[in-house]
């Protein structure tokens, strides 16, 4: 067992998430930090995006969002705040959605970590 990889703590996962988010490496975040059966929860008032389970569905949801974007002008994510097995951060983007004018979108994202992997993400906007 001495060759086994150490399980990342919630702080480790949050730090790595933030490191990758700063350079827009969202696919790498999903590939590296998410559990295969992770759940992604959108608010009830979300237009078009739904709550899904499993990485294939989460990737498809990301692709669906990308197809709604006409032009991405910029984005940000703040330093994560860790409490127990959860971390949260504020994220946002300056974006033009297809058929709409340029806008700023801001949200709070909360992530649950179990055994070194993200098992749930929930968005508030």
Locate predicted features.
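A solvent-exposed, acidic/Ser-Thr-rich amphipathic alpha-helical stretch
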Residues: 27-79
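Short acidic-aromatic low-complexity motifs
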Residues: 3-37
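Short beta-strand segments enriched in hydrophobic/aromatic residues
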Residues: 34, 93-95, 109, 125
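A short hydrophobic beta-strand element
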Residues: 83-93
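Hydrophobic/aromatic beta-strand elements that line small-molecule binding cavities or substrate pockets
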Residues: 75-80, 94, 106-111
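Short, cysteine-centered beta-strand-loop-beta hairpins and adjacent loop/turn segments enriched
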Residues: 68, 95-103
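Short beta-strand edge/turn micro-motifs at domain boundaries
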Residues: 106-125
């Amino acid at each position: 067992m001495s060759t086994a990889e150490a399980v990342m703590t919630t702080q480790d996962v949050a730090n790595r998430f933030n490191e990758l988010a700063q350079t827009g490496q969202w696919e790498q975040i999903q590939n590296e930090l998410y559990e295969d059966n992770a759940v992604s929860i959108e608010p009830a008032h979300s237009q078009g995006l739904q709550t899904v389970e499993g990485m294939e569905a989460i990737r498809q949801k990301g692709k669906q969002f990308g197809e709604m974007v006409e032009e991405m002008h910029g984005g940000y994510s703040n330093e994560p705040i860790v409490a127990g097995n959860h971390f949260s951060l504020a994220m946002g983007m300056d974006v033009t959605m297809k058929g709409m004018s340029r806008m700023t979108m801001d949200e709070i994202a909360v992530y649950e970590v179990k055994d070194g992997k993200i098992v749930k993400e929930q968005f508030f906007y």
